[in-house]
């Protein structure tokens, strides 16, 4: 039976977030709802989750020794990674010492780079994926492209939000694609994956929860990507019953193989009744922010329930809903938001993340909407997002 202590008291139940962005902020809020003590960690100060945490720390999370010292200092009951750029070998070591890592250290280690999870899915589980090759030198990269053929996609094995990704259609693009991939990796230059282009009708995120009362699924989430980053997401994504069943089967296999309790964002390509595995994150997914308005429990609430060992019960989906990102482009350490009166009309909500600064394009918030159908919800969310004017000095 779970016992939760009182935050800021000797019997507190402590949760340490490794990564304190907008997703971590919502996880922190859900932890606060249950009286958990929240320690937010990131590589920069004043990150969004730090605004709603009891304490915060700024460290290089790729530094295993620094991470180990902080865990020894704070003694968390749960370590909850929000990002991939973490010293996952240290998480494995800490777990072996009795520390609870969410969902488990193996899941964070395998999914921190595309090689580990692709080998698990394609070779161990024998799931359908795109054709692929790995390369750690420029010559090996060129050979991989020749084997895969054009068009193909190159990605650093360790990157997120589209960083370092390129679509290659012909040989003259190879040098620029290789150079960009080397700049975009989370740990600097290194190995890349070259993937054959998959012809699909649409992409989905299937939020899959592994909990004490079994495997649960949210309704499929559709999304639109631009420059490797999501711009809008919607729920539910219409798809055939056969495709839904296949998607659940694939997601269940992946989640069970990774292990542990928590919510997983399983990314899949859908073409008719055919479903192809793409990627998985062992944590809430950015496209899943639509669940802040579309469900009785958001993906963040589900994640917290699951990793605490609590039953999930019933997930209710309220109908057509959408999210659209607020993505301004400017440079400022003193950001201001205007136009909320125009944005907040009808069935809309706004989330502003509270990021401390911006240099270029940065996702600073999200607009949420519900409507009679997903197309209408998307348009309402996009209008609301565009109504928010961001300025800075």
Swiss-Prot record:
GO terms for biological process: 'de novo' IMP biosynthetic process. ATP binds at residues 114, 155, 160-165, 195-198, 203. Coiled coil: none annotated. Gene3D superfamilies: 3.40.50.20, ATP-grasp fold, A domain, ATP-grasp fold, B domain. It catalyses: N(1)-(5-phospho-beta-D-ribosyl)glycinamide + formate + ATP = N(2)-formyl-N(1)-(5-phospho-beta-D-ribosyl)glycinamide + ADP + phosphate + H(+). It holds the Pfam family RS_preATP-grasp-like. Its EC number is 6.3.1.21. Keywords: ATP-binding, Ligase, Magnesium, Metal-binding, Nucleotide-binding, Purine biosynthesis. The keyword Transmembrane helix does not apply. One of its GO terms (cellular component) is cytosol. Mg(2+) binds at residues 267, 279. PROSITE patterns: ATP_GRASP. Residues 119-308 form the ATP-grasp domain. N(1)-(5-phospho-beta-D-ribosyl)glycinamide binds at residues 22-23, 82, 286, 355, 362-363. Pathway: Purine metabolism; IMP biosynthesis via de novo pathway; N(2)-formyl-N(1)-(5-phospho-D-ribosyl)glycinamide from N(1)-(5-phospho-D-ribosyl)glycinamide (formate route): step 1/1. One of its GO terms (molecular function) is phosphoribosylglycinamide formyltransferase 2 activity. InterPro entries: ATP-grasp, ATP-grasp_carboxylate-amine, ATP_grasp_subdomain_1, PreATP-grasp_dom_sf, PurT, PurT/PurK_preATP-grasp, PurT_C, Rudment_hybrid_motif. Homodimer. Belongs to the PurK/PurT family. Involved in the de novo purine biosynthesis. Catalyzes the transfer of formate to 5-phospho-ribosyl-glycinamide (GAR), producing 5-phospho-ribosyl-N-formylglycinamide (FGAR). Formate is provided by PurU via hydrolysis of 10-formyl-tetrahydrofolate. NCBIfam families: PRK09288.1, purT. This is Formate-dependent phosphoribosylglycinamide formyltransferase. It comes from Yersinia enterocolitica serotype O:8 / biotype 1B (strain NCTC 13174 / 8081). The lineage of its organism: Bacteria, Pseudomonadati, Pseudomonadota, Gammaproteobacteria, Enterobacterales. The gene is purT.
């Amino acid at each position: 039976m779970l016992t939760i202590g009182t935050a800021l008291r000797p019997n507190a139940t402590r949760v340490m977030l490794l990564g304190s962005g907008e997703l971590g902020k919502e996880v922190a809020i859900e932890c606060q709802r249950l009286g958990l003590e929240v320690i937010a960690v990131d590589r920069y100060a004043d990150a969004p989750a730090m605004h709603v945490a009891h304490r915060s720390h700024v460290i290089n999370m790729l530094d295993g020794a620094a991470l180990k010292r902080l865990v020894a200092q704070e003694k968390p009951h749960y370590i909850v990674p929000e990002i991939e750029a973490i010293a996952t070998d240290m998480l494995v070591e800490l777990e072996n010492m009795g520390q609870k890592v969410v969902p488990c250290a193996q899941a964070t280690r395998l999914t921190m780079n595309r090689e580990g999870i692709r080998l698990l899915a394609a070779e161990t589980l024998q799931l359908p994926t795109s054709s692929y090759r790995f390369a750690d030198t420029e010559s090996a990269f060129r050979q991989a492209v020749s084997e895969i053929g054009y068009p193909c996609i190159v990605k650093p094995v360790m990157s997120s939000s589209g960083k370092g990704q390129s679509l290659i259609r012909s040989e003259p693009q190879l040098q620029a694609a290789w150079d960009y991939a080397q700049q975009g990796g989370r740990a600097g230059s290194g190995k890349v994956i070259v993937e054959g282009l998959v012809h699909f009708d649409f992409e989905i995120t299937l939020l899959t929860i592994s909990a004490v009362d079994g495997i649960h699924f949210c309704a499929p989430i559709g999304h639109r990507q631009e420059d490797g980053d999501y711009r809008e997401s919607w729920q539910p994504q219409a798809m055939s019953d056969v495709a839904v069943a296949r998607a659940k089967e694939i997601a269940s296999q992946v989640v069970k193989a990774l292990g542990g309790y928590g919510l997983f964002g399983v990314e899949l390509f859908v073409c008719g009744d055919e479903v192809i595995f793409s990627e998985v994150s062992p944590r809430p997914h950015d496209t899943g922010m639509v669940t802040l308005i579309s469900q009785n429990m958001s993906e963040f609430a589900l994640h917290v329930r699951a990793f605490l060992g609590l039953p999930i019960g019933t997930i209710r989906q309220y109908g057509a809903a959408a999210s659209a990102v607020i993505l301004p482009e400017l440079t400022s350490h003193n950001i201001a938001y205007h136009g909320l009166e125009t944005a907040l009309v009808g069935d809309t909500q706004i989330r502003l993340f509270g990021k401390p600064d911006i240099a270029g394009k940065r996702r600073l918030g999200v607009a949420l909407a519900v409507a009679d159908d997903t197309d209408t919800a998307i348009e309402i969310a996009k209008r609301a997002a565009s109504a928010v004017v961001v300025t800075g000095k």
